[in-house]
Amino acid sequence: MPDPKTTAAITAVGTYLPPDRLTNADLEKLVDTNDEWIRTRTGIEERRILRDPDKATSDMATEAARQCLEKAGVGPDDVDCILVATVTPDMVFPATACLVQHKLGASNAWGYDISAACSGFLYALTTGAKLVESGMHRRVLVIGADTMSRIIDYTDRTTCVIFGDGAGAVLLEPTTDGTGLLDTVQYVDGSGVDSLSQPAGGSLRPATHETVEARLHHVQQDGKAVFKRAVVGMADAAAEILERNGLEGNDVRYLVPHQANLRIIDATARRMGIGPEQVMVNIARYGNTTAATLPLCLGDWEDRLRHGDNLVLAAFGGGFTWGASWLKWSYDGTGQGT
């Protein structure tokens, strides 16, 4: 009889949200918008903002990772690898993962960053899972963290109403009980570069007086183009995961969608044939936290989950990047939930 297959299971979740809230009423004072317009088009009511000028993405990531390890009963020295998904690193280099490794005290871990915008956590989860499945590592921390408030133009109502700050982390460990990350589909289409980007700050447009004055170091978005592609991309990827694995909507306990826009989430759920009670949605409270949305959902719903629950994670981000994963949950929550 062959040995059971080793997969990578999520064994703990940790989250961090800055204490300061930016409400729709607050934004009404900054730009020409209103609460009804924002809620109707995005589903967002408030978002968290990291206001401390001495704190950055690595600090939020470290707090989420620390909570995750404490819940797992694992010490920092027992972590083999740290993967950080982010588009708002503390600095261009070194990698945010290096800073987290130091702040966490994970002296035996190596790691690096993954930049795939709102799909970043999904990509990092796949990468971490392969490190575990291969037998190379036993414990991999996968973190999604972004401080979007630092790259948002708060005079641009098309972007400032959408984004917030936060971090989430999961610990991946090997299992042979049939749970864990079971399948993934991922895609890239680089023709979307001009639809969603931070144009300046890299080697193409390094910082100059001109780039700063032109506000090219802030997020630039063609909202209509992104919405059109995101609706199709997330829904198609989620449907593909079901079809590849002989699953139907009623086999799925929860869809865990990237929290970009409530209308995109609803379209993905309809394509999968699942009801609203099967969808994790916290966008009203946090907005779009980019790479942190998926682990923040897992953190909010962790106590409701049961061993063997089928989850479908789906995301779409700048690039364009998109994909979906089938994850079978590996432990029982407390039964309380968010």
Predicted regions and their residues:
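Condensing-enzyme catalytic core mediating Claisen C-C bond formation in acyl metabolism
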Residues: 1-53, 156-228, 232, 236, ...
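Buried hydrophobic positions in well-ordered alpha/beta secondary-structure cores of metabolic enzymes
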Residues: 10-12, 38, 68, 79-82, ...
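Short beta-strand segments
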Residues: 11-14, 85, 115, 140-146, ...
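Claisen-condensing/thiolase-fold acyl-transfer catalytic domains that form or cleave C-C bonds
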Residues: 58, 62-65, 69, 88-89, ...
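Anion-binding (especially nucleotide phosphate/pyrophosphate-binding) glycine-rich loop
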Residues: 71, 75-107
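Short glycine-rich phosphate-binding loop at a beta-alpha junction
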Residues: 77-85, 249-258
